[in-house]
Curated annotation (Swiss-Prot):
Gene designation: rps3ae
Stated name of the protein: Small ribosomal subunit protein eS1
Alphabetical keyword list: Ribonucleoprotein, Ribosomal protein
Family: Belongs to the eukaryotic ribosomal protein eS1 family.
Any Pfam family the entry gives: Ribosomal_S3Ae
Species of origin: Pyrobaculum aerophilum (strain ATCC 51768 / DSM 7523 / JCM 9630 / CIP 104966 / NBRC 100827 / IM2)
GO-annotated cellular components: cytosol; ribonucleoprotein complex; ribosome
Gene Ontology MF term list: structural constituent of ribosome
Length: 221
């Protein structure tokens, strides 16, 4: 009898979904990581929580801070945990808009780009691109020296902090300010920005949480 009731209920759900695909969807509230205050990011629909796992959401840093100067900073977050109708995220990447980068590069200045991989204290691996703009043109030797110093600073800073602390310093502008100080010892600077970040590997503890979530959802299905 119980099996028959389940079969009937399943048929009813299928019939409803065919008439209106949105009828069975739930709305989940998505939140930023705790080091960003766990602020609300958006609401997303899904038939079940499992389908939300690993979904990527893109927002502007302005959406979190309400600081107009943060509009050009695009962030990517990945849903890695679901608690009821609450979806929790982890940082996935950052990128400055092309229009903003073009606005920084002016005639008579030099652009210095430093790209490196860093590893945080808790094991997160990221590829980071830093963009430095000088007040006037500089030579190849100065560019190389500046690039080397910025990379050394990035690697050292990452190794001293866990991923949450490191990302917080990036998003608050603290790391860019530190890099500006390092760079201006070599040449006068107009601007230093973290231009792009891509997460290559998450901390082991964080990966374990994702695996547990996925297993729990499959088991309960």
């Amino acid at each position: 009898m119980a099996e028959k009731q389940k079969a009937v209920a399943k048929q009813e759900k299928v019939a409803i979904s065919k008439r209106d695909p949105w009828a069975l969807k739930k709305w989940f509230s998505v939140y930023a990581p705790s080091y960003l205050g766990g602020v609300f990011l958006a609401e997303v629909p899904a038939n079940e929580a499992q389908k939300l796992l690993m979904r990527t959401l893109e927002v502007s840093l302005y959406d979190i801070t309400k600081d107009i100067s943060h509009l050009p900073i695009k962030l990517k977050f990945q849903i890695h945990r679901v608690e009821g109708l609450k979806a929790l995220t982890r940082f996935k990447g950052l990128e400055l808009t092309r229009d903003y980068i073009r606005s920084l590069v002016r005639k008579g200045t030099s652009k210095v780009t430093a790209i490196t991989e860093v590893k945080t204290k808790d094991g997160m691996v990221m590829r980071i691109a830093v963009l430095g703009i000088t007040t006037h043109r500089i030579g190849t030797a100065q560019k190389s020296a500046m690039r080397k110093k910025m990379i050394e600073t990035l690697v050292k800073k990452a190794a001293e902090l866990d991923s949450g602390q490191f990302l917080k310093e990036i998003l608050e502008g603290t790391l860019a300010a530190d890099l500006f100080i390092v760079a201006k010892k070599i040449a006068p600077m107009r601007k230093v920005e973290i231009a792009k970040i891509k997460v290559l590997k998450y901390p082991p503890e964080e990966e374990q949480i994702v695996v547990k979530e996925a297993v729990a959802e499959v088991t309960s299905a």
